[in-house]
Amino acid sequence: MRECISIHIGQAGIQVGNACWELYCLEHGIQPDGQMPGDKTVGGGDDAFNTFFSETGAGKHVPRAVFVDLEPTVIDEVRTGAYRQLFHPEQLISGKEDAANNFARGHYTIGKEIVDLCLDRIRKLSDNCTGLQGFLVFNAVGGGTGSGLGSLLLERLSVDYGKKSKLGFTVYPSPQVSTSVVEPYNSVLSTHSLLEHTDVSILLDNEAIYDICRRSLDIERPTYTNLNRLVSQVISSLTASLRFDGALNVDVNEFQTNLVPYPRIHFMLSSYAPVISAEKAYHEQLSVAEITNSAFEPSSMMAKCDPRHGKYMACCLMYRGDVVPKDVNAAVATIKTKRTIQFVDWCPTGFKCGINYQPPGVVPGGDLAKVQRAVCMISNSTSVVEVFSRIDHKFDLMYAKRAFVHWYVGEGMEEGEFSEAREDLAALEKDYEEVGAEFDDGEDGDEGDEY
């Protein structure tokens, strides 16, 4: 089997994780207590969904997941929620005091007390796998736990499981909406380690997802639950080919191979279509061509940046439901003729497609309509750099005055780490610039030494 272990860190990671596991259970017909009436082979490990669930002798299905937070309130919601019987109590790890939005607390003082316990639990999960293929890491980089403990865990995973791929689902700070003043610091410090220790990072941003909920689902005041259910559809589409059988299956390592041209350029945009409410879906015929087009709409992107300002390097389309390869090829051919969707000149083909026959599931009482087919797009576009330059700008404004820095230094960080991380991000912005540049400038000479 090719198992995946999910690691959910901090409030964002845990709440997105809740939405994901709820959706996985619905898609596989697993009840909240872990029983699966449709599964005839008790304890048999060869079903496709066993990549994400392990089976006990009693026929209970347990998620291969760890939830970690430095304070108990968010994890207590899992411990008392509808799916409390699904998770093994050892998989829910919570500390006593939180990271207080401080990267240094999550990474150095408080985080290092809990990280060995987490690694121990992850080790137990991985011993339970026959062929672990990688980790899915869910966190946000604006807070303290997601950024600090998240980076610490990723660094330790690189040491313990060097060759295994790590896929990150990372919530980045939004341009207008902010949950804490020191978001720019935490984001820059933690992106510094994401650059080194994740193989593919999929950027999400609350504001972009708010706008999608408002525009496409007519929810006037979206809550985190609305956002997370939308995010979980994307993640479910990505992992569908690991959990079900399909025509063109895609492995976690395949994302990496097809989307990452250079090791540092691994921050992806994602979009999902159709995002449509039940009353509208009734009146629309959502053909493959239509959903493919809307996946490329700038307004469908789940991070606030405009792909028309950059060029695509590669793009991965994961279809699910009633889709045949012929329609996909036709839709992709149409996309290629569009002038607004530009690819870099050194990557002429640029599309990887996957098809999965399992139609998208929906949470009962959720906002999304039940549809016959859906597509999720993960793309590597140079426009992602907008996300970083925005954060860098805010970082510079604060750091010029050394505002709030004493909180970090007081927890055992050195000021040098700020400038080191900031330089790394400046280099990343430069990398994106060079990748998007045309080849005729003869720039490729100096890139040869770098990689």
Swiss-Prot record:
This is Tubulin alpha-2 chain. It catalyses: GTP + H2O = GDP + phosphate + H(+). The keyword GTP-binding applies. Undergoes a tyrosination/detyrosination cycle, the cyclic removal and re-addition of a C-terminal tyrosine residue by the enzymes tubulin tyrosine carboxypeptidase (TTCP) and tubulin tyrosine ligase (TTL), respectively. It comes from Hordeum vulgare. Its main location: cytoplasm. GTP binds at residues 11, 71, 144-145, 179, 206, 228. The lineage of its organism: Eukaryota, Viridiplantae, Streptophyta, Embryophyta, Tracheophyta. The record marks 451 as: Involved in polymerization. InterPro entries: Alpha_tubulin (IPR002452), Tub_FtsZ_C (IPR008280), Tubulin (IPR000217), Tubulin/FtsZ-like_C (IPR037103), Tubulin/FtsZ_2-layer-sand-dom (IPR018316), Tubulin/FtsZ_GTPase_sf (IPR036525), Tubulin_C (IPR023123), Tubulin_CS (IPR017975). The gene is TUBA2. The modification N6-acetyllysine is found at residue 40. The active site is at residue 254.
